Amino acid sequence: MAARVAAAVAAALLAAALLLPGAAAEWTLTKKGTVVSYDERSLMIDGKRDLFFSGAIHYPRSPPEMWDKLVKTAKMGGLNTIETYVFWNGHEPEPGKYYFEGRFDLIRFLNVIKDNDMYAIVRIGPFIQAEWNHGGLPYWLREIGHIIFRANNEPFKREMEKFVRFIVQKLKDAEMFAPQGGPIILSQIENEYGNIKKDRKVEGDKYLEWAAEMAISTGIGVPWVMCKQSIAPGEVIPTCNGRHCGDTWTLLDKNKPRLWTENWTAQFRTFGDQLAQRSAEDIAYAVLRFFAKGGTLVNYYMYHGGTNFGRTGASYVLTGYYDEAPMDEYGMCKEPKFGHLRDLHNVIKSYHKAFLWGKQSFEILGHGYEAHNYELPEDKLCLSFLSNNNTGEDGTVVFRGEKFYVPSRSVSILADCKTVVYNTKRVFVQHSERSFHTTDETSKNNVWEMYSEAIPKFRKTKVRTKQPLEQYNQTKDTSDYLWYTTSFRLESDDLPFRRDIRPVIQIKSTAHAMIGFANDAFVGTGRGSKREKSFVFEKPMDLRVGINHIAMLSSSMGMKDSGGELVEVKGGIQDCVVQGLNTGTLDLQGNGWGHKARLEGEDKEIYTEKGMAQFQWKPAENDLPITWYKRYFDEPDGDDPIVVDMSSMSKGMIYVNGEGIGRYWTSFITLAGHPSQSVYHIPRAFLKPKGNLLIIFEEELGKPGGILIQTVRRDDICVFISEHNPAQIKTWESDGGQIKLIAEDTSTRGTLNCPPKRTIQEVVFASFGNPEGACGNFTAGTCHTPDAKAIVEKECLGKESCVLPVVNTVYGADINCPATTATLAVQLLLASHVMRIAICVRPMLFARNGIVTSVLAHILGHPEWDRKSLRVKMAGRQNPCPDFTPTKSYGYLFSKPLVALTVSLDSNLSP
């Protein structure tokens, strides 16, 4: 056996060596001397027209350890391009001091794109909006005299040009532009200027012309674009941003290609917003409407939104960004959005020759029905897009002598102008739903300690003025928090005689939230919203005879990210009075105010191990405002994404091992009765196996014992498919632009596949007929077939995948039922079979965990295994891992040199 296993190890070592870094595919998309140009039809790479399916992934919104997987997954989704903004305030936090480390390592991110054989679009801006703090503009710009942002204003143009040229040179030095052999094929100057151009009038046109000329003068060798415009200066290409650019946007310059720089895959959300979704069907419909009319580049904004870590989100914007994108906040594929768009990309690319070079024609087939055709008669190639633009009205049209059924608000692709190979409303791919699981590792030692911030008094503050100061000028974007404090004297006849009558403090604020204290007693909280420019804090409070101290902690949920008046946006107390006194209203606005920017915990970095040691901690208590809480937790096993559930808390900040996870605000309840976001992503890259420091700053009231560390899975998969769907993409292929069937059975089928290490445990729902709803919320219709669930159980239970025919006879359905849509809806619950492996390795043979992982994977027959699922410990020469206690062991012992492998498995799997 030893010889047999030794041979397996040797083979595994060879295979592992081939998998080590450096074995990436050679870059072939561009080379030194590549020419990127354009004509009226498309961008051209070395004179060849091409199609570009792009996805927005912003490098600062995910840790570098996630970038490669995100880009690889995007490529699996049929994309060939990744788009990103460049974040000025992240790269130049102080004038002339640049930062390109960690999540802001732009060059590393572009190299990841290059290593995965994809193009890049870089939107330099440098104003970007992006729901990013201050629209990406550094705060210090506001302190430059006479500056007006994004205008024909010399101070702004000087700083803008300096940064643009700095970024361009940095990209050139790294050989990132296509003519240098790099991935960048397109760059953007400015951003959605049409939104504020009306405020700039003639000066706005001058500014745009200057920006275009300045950008072109940098000589990057690839085209520049200006987005959300119908026309752009000179050779700059205007592009569209929006949901339905095929129907809402007109390109005025007919010598330039139709490019779509932002196809919004959902609606970004702010605290207080309810869930906002955009269906896969609507996105696909919009894309094909745009391509039917000649579009050749679409960029999904966002394809992966990621996380607004720390304080990077704009005013009120959720910490989780575009979670409804094709890849969710954690990088997991959101089905059916991911798969339905992947199929669309593959279909169009299969017929790119007819599409890019064919003669275009247009036909009206009826009210709301259109055909857009692309034909190359000499090559016998024909491609047609049949559109039904009517809402709620399915229909059948006659096109070139044949009848075609086209659902409402959908587009069908006819690959040879007669065979339907894709319809935007007919979804084949499975659906999926997320679930959250509290792990044993994180539930242990759930012991919290706390430290409460001191409430400042007027006489101890250093910045004192007659009236309250503007907030941003004090915090300078280094903190969300500014203390305002004032003191005043009351006599006994000032106070109400009745004890049931309490004075009321009224404060008008243009900040985002406020916490009030009177004589150190908590008074209450107040807040605004994204839609309100100000709010009124109005709370009763207890006052006393003598000196009374008022302290208000004003907070900002990010700086505004757009608008022509961005430099003029203010925050803080605008008016303050006390009502309900016997002597009338007391106006405190001119009473004299003290200010303290930032929290003590921020100043001393309480969220780090070093900073934490400067404070006296005590056992945690519930429902204390302005309090820091801390505990330690171990990293959950496996590689599932990790979140922290903050449902038991109210509002504040989260830190893990010194990293700012972001703002939370679970006390801001939507109209639906729940928080906009209650779980917050903790990237595994921020963690170590044991003893992770979790720090919470709670502004209001909360119960830290209820905070949960959880893992995220997509445990429910679904299919929702009709007999009317066209043949699945897997049943045909393109042969020189001609359609070719590759399967004998082209009937409609629903295919359900489990993720790795999962099997089908339960059929939660199954119905054939006219079911309604969505994955996780299906309901049976009036034509429901009672036998459907038993049939699906027989076909699927215990398996890693199953194929379900979508044929009424299989389920005993009554095809004559008046309301039937011949639709199958199935929801399956998956079982998790996670194999936990622990290895004790003697020295000399194995130097890297990655090789150990590959060896074990090959020995055990699980090549998909990754190092996150393994625990590796190097044994000492005299001490063979004494703390290693596997539950079930399989030993392997070799010599020359010695190596010992001890493998521990759980009960789900055996070697």
Swiss-Prot record:
This is Beta-galactosidase 12. The lineage of its organism: Eukaryota, Viridiplantae, Streptophyta, Embryophyta, Tracheophyta. Gene3D superfamilies: 2.60.120.740, Galactose-binding domain-like, Glycosidases. Residues 744-831 form the SUEL-type lectin domain. GO terms for biological process: galactose catabolic process; plant-type cell wall modification. It is found in: Secreted, Extracellular space, Apoplast. Pfam families: BetaGal_gal-bd, GHD, Glyco_hydro_35, SUEL_Lectin. Glycans are attached at N263, N389, N473, N777. GO terms for molecular function: beta-galactosidase activity; carbohydrate binding. It comes from the Eukaryota. PANTHER family: BETA-GALACTOSIDASE RELATED.
